[in-house]
Regions:
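Non-catalytic cap/lid and distal C-terminal segments of serine-dependent acyl enzymes
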Residues: 1-251
Length: 251
């Protein structure tokens, strides 16, 4: 699969690059950003952190604003940031042009309902297609970590819990912990997955943690003055689920 380089900037001795490619999984062209630390030019394979951004974001937000490249350069760590949804001609968005569903709000799941099912398969893209592409074109090893913020934090937790052995670490900043029980999640799940709540359980970290076959420790960072804390994020739900399952969680 070919890559088209869209931009390239020197950063902390390495390179911050942006690429476009066609995704067979999503049925559209996608962009992603990658940081290649200085060690990428020295030979050998490097570990990769996949970063999943939140609602309304693109592949550029974290890579342009977070400043994580400095630490990645020190650690010899590749960072890969995909977009937050499929985009482009023929990809449906929210019929009301809302910001919390559709374009920029793919929720890192595999939609089953029309018209979303054809394109909104962000889970398979993030877990399977994108890493295969990255490992084919860059000096990236199969030592993977995954992290994210808000909707992306939800995505990181779900990707790790659903795919034992796929990641060596998982962490999240202010994640949507219990999407089945918050307005953002309920809106997205009802449209992407339908009204049958039993199908929602497959994409909720609080449910998945009780069924996890791998005890991969979870690291969650949450500010106690977050405006969305009580209604949307619900870290206490994840804490209770982890305690009940005996799953290690640092919150």
């Amino acid at each position: 699969m070919s890559l088209e380089n869209l931009s390239c900037q020197k950063s902390f001795g390495g390179w911050h690059k942006r690429y476009k490619h066609h995704s067979d999984v999503l049925g559209c062209d996608m962009t992603f950003a990658v940081y290649l630390p200085p060690q990428a030019e020295q030979g050998g394979k490097l570990p990769v952190l996949y970063w999943l951004s939140g609602l309304t974001c693109t592949d550029e937000n974290f890579m342009q604003k977070a400043g994580a490249q400095r630490m990645a350069a020190e650690l010899g760590l590749i960072i890969v940031a995909p977009d937050t949804s499929p985009r482009g001609l023929g990809v449906p968005g929210d019929p009301d042009n809302a910001w919390d569903f559709g374009l920029g709000a793919g929720f890192y799941l595999n939609a089953t309902q029309e018209p979303w099912a054809k394109h909104y398969r962000m889970h398979d893209y993030v877990v399977q297609e994108l890493p295969a592409l990255v490992e084919a074109h860059f000096p990236a090893s199969d030592k993977r970590g995954i992290s994210g913020h808000s909707m992306g934090g939800h995505g990181a937790l779900v990707c790790a819990l659903r795919n034992p052995g796929r990641y060596l670490s998982v962490s999240a900043f202010s994640p949507i912990n219990n999407p089945m029980d918050c307005p953002w999640g309920q809106k997205a799940f009802s449209r992407y997955l339908g009204e049958e709540r039993s199908k929602w359980r497959e994409w909720d970290a609080c449910v998945l943690i009780s069924e996890a076959s791998e005890q991969l420790p979870l690291l969650v960072d949450q500010g106690d003055r977050d405006d969305f804390l009580a209604v949307q994020l619900k870290p206490e739900a994840l804490q209770q689920a982890a305690k009940a399952a005996g799953h290690r969680l640092e919150l």
